[in-house]
Amino acid sequence: MAVQKNKPTRSKRGMRRSHDSLTAPHLSIDKFSGETHIRHHITNNGYYKGKKVI
């Protein structure tokens, strides 16, 4: 089992945690219906890039 020789510094801890933060979802407004949706996802009405897919 791997056991560390020295205690990791606060700097190393911070560097490891630098990618842990949460980001807000990137939202877009559909040009045709005016509905807000997550980018690269279909709208609630089933439209994607102005075409009905569902």
From Swiss-Prot:
Keyword Ribosomal protein belongs to the record: yes
GO CC annotation terms, alphabetical: large ribosomal subunit
Signal peptide interval: none
Coiled coil: none
Disulfide bonds: none
Keywords annotated in UniProt: Ribonucleoprotein, Ribosomal protein
SUPFAM superfamilies hit by this protein: Zn-binding ribosomal proteins (SSF57829)
Compositionally biased region (Basic residues): 7-16
Domain of life: Bacteria
Family: Belongs to the bacterial ribosomal protein bL32 family.
Official protein name in the record: Large ribosomal subunit protein bL32
